[in-house]
A protein has these predicted regions:
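Catalytic cores and adjacent flexible loops of soluble metabolic enzymes
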Residues: 1-341
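Metal-ion/cofactor- or nucleotide/acyl-coenzyme-handling active-site neighborhoods
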Residues: 339-524
């Protein structure tokens, strides 16, 4: 049986879920719990030159800062940090003295591998254990990976890692890379494995490494509760239990469960991580998981839409996340549809100079149904937004969301005003999607704001808003119909509320805007 060590990366990889803001006391509690659990190697966070130090955040600029959360008695545990190539200058490292971290993990993309190994050499020369992290290992050809291994042999670091950055590595892929490394890597160098869980394979892949007949020393990364970017990581608590049961492990599970219960659960509620369909799609397309997160946060796309956007991506853009790139790709995709405006003149005649009531699907549209019913008269034009309001037969339905359009009964299509991103026949009007966008990213194509802009252009005199409640962190509070509720990150919801408020204020300077029903999280 090969010797296995566990490296817990909760304080570093988990930081993608909370912007590394664990809180100073929680940082110390997590470290203490990991030591109690007998975890072999503890990663404390990022080391970088590009930030300012904040003790509540696990992004550090010096080893003195991270030493504040490392116990004086390390109890035989190894403490490390990770630096992304180019974000820290090894010249700033003091000589190793055992007080702070014992090693540094250097993560790099294939294009930077030669220069990154030079940085690793400088770090090793200062006495630290060096962990070589070849990100997106599957992006290498066998020849390229062998060349990297030969260069690593010359360096002779502490460990060389196989890295499944996008959670797409299947057992046959892992086995192939492992034997390639095992047969060619200097025997003095340990073999590491870092995985993500986009395809729910992190646990089974780790087990397969445990079960391999090899004399090599292994280091396998995990995080408590699987806390990590996108689909998360291998769960520390599950993996060490497996080692206890199958590989003579000597880990205490209880401190790990306490970390989950007392600290991580709260972060999970605010910004969940774990397996999801978008994260599966990113892995299937060998793309950075943040792309999936961006598209999922839109809540406007079907699985087919996301697949088509991934298919549009340039191969060289998939490896590193580029927010501007995916935003432009999303907008280009959404703007590809046709427009059909033969009834536009008729609509303008019906809207110009009139009072408009826009009914969005917020909970107040149901709770204050009597107020809505009593407000409506023959001089008010009623439009429901992104759904068919069940309590009033509205004059029109405005839709910009393909998901919502598909849920609509076909008999209602003749009164639908849809944006051009929705492929639709037999609708009243199909208007240009791109012309209704606003300037704030979080709500750039929010249906309610698009409707306000559209009917303002049509000449509405006053626009009253019903069901424009904004977004609660409790998804059950957001919609009058429970089937419309969706779960998303609280940071996204907060940004949407801020963006809606800002745009409502802007539009109120162009047209008279008033709330008819109680709003909770937005205002004019």
């Amino acid at each position: 049986m090969n010797k296995i060590q566990v490296l817990d990366c909760t304080l570093r990889d988990g930081g993608y879920c909370n912007d590394c803001r664990f809180g100073f006391e929680n940082e110390k509690k997590i470290v203490h719990g990991l030591v109690e659990a007998n975890v072999d190697i503890i990663e404390c966070g990022f080391l970088m030159n590009t930030v300012e130090y904040d003790q509540d955040v696990t992004r550090f600029t010096s080893l003195d800062e991270v030493a504040k959360i490392i116990p004086k008695d390390k109890e035989g545990k190894t403490f490390v940090m990770l630096t992304d190539y180019g974000k820290y200058h090894p010249e700033n490292l003091p000589e190793y003295n055992g007080v702070s971290v014992d090693g540094l993990r250097v993560a790099f993309h294939k294009k930077d591998r030669v220069a990154a190994l030079e940085e690793c050499k400088k770090i090793k020369n200062k006495g630290y254990k060096v962990f070589v992290q070849a990100m997106v290992s599957l992006s290498y050809t066998d020849e390229e990976f062998l060349d990297l291994i030969h260069r690593v042999n010359e360096l002779e670091p502490y460990v060389f890692y196989i890295v499944d950055s996008f959670g797409m590595m299947k057992r046959k892929d892992l086995t192939r890379l492992f034997y390639l490394v095992e047969h060619n890597l200097n025997e003095k160098i340990k073999i590491g494995f870092h995985s993500h869980n986009n395809m729910q394979l992190a646990y089974s892949n780790a087990q397969s490494l445990v079960d391999l007949h090899s004399d090599r020393e292994l280091i396998i990364d995990s995080s408590v509760y699987g806390m990590g970017r996108g689909a998360g990581n291998l769960n520390t608590e599950l993996f060490v239990q497996y080692l206890n049961d199958n590989a003579d492990g000597n880990y205490d599970i209880k401190p790990l469960l306490s970390i989950i219960d007392e600290i991580l659960n709260e972060f999970y509620q605010r910004n969940y991580w774990g397996y999801s369909l978008p994260n599966y799609l990113s892995a299937a397309h060998n793309a950075h998981p943040n792309y999936a997160g961006y598209l999922d946060d839109k809540k406007t796309l079907t699985v087919e839409n996301m697949n088509e956007i991934f298919d549009m991506m340039d191969e060289d853009k998939k490896v590193s996340y580029d927010k501007d790139y995916i935003e432009q790709l999303y907008l280009r995709y959404m703007a590809t549809g046709k427009s059909q405006e033969e009834h536009k003149t008729d609509l303008q005649k019906k809207i110009k100079g009139k009072t408009i009531l826009l009914i969005a699907p917020g909970k107040s549209s149901i709770e204050e149904r009597k107020k809505i019913a009593s407000f409506i008269n023959e001089d008010v034009v009623t439009i429901s937004v992104n759904y068919n309001y069940p309590l009033v037969n509205t004059d029109y339905i405005f839709l910009s969301n393909l998901r919502r359009f598909r849920e609509l009964n076909a008999s209602n299509r003749e009164k639908c005003i849809v944006t051009s991103n929705i492929p639709a026949d037999n609708v009243y009007i199909q208007t240009k999607y791109r012309e209704l966008l606003c300037d704030i990213e979080a709500v750039k194509d929010n249906a309610g704001l698009m409707a306000i802009k559209y009917f303002t252009q049509m000449g509405a005199k006053k626009i009253y808003l019903a069901g424009f409640d904004g977004y609660s962190h409790d998804e059950k509070e957001n919609y009058g119909e429970s089937t419309m509720a969706f779960v998303t990150r609280t940071a996204v919801l907060d940004a949407m509320n801020v963006g809606m408020t800002e745009m409502l204020k802007k539009y109120s300077s162009i047209v008279e805007l008033k709330f008819l029903t109680e709003q909770h999280y937005v205002k004019i």
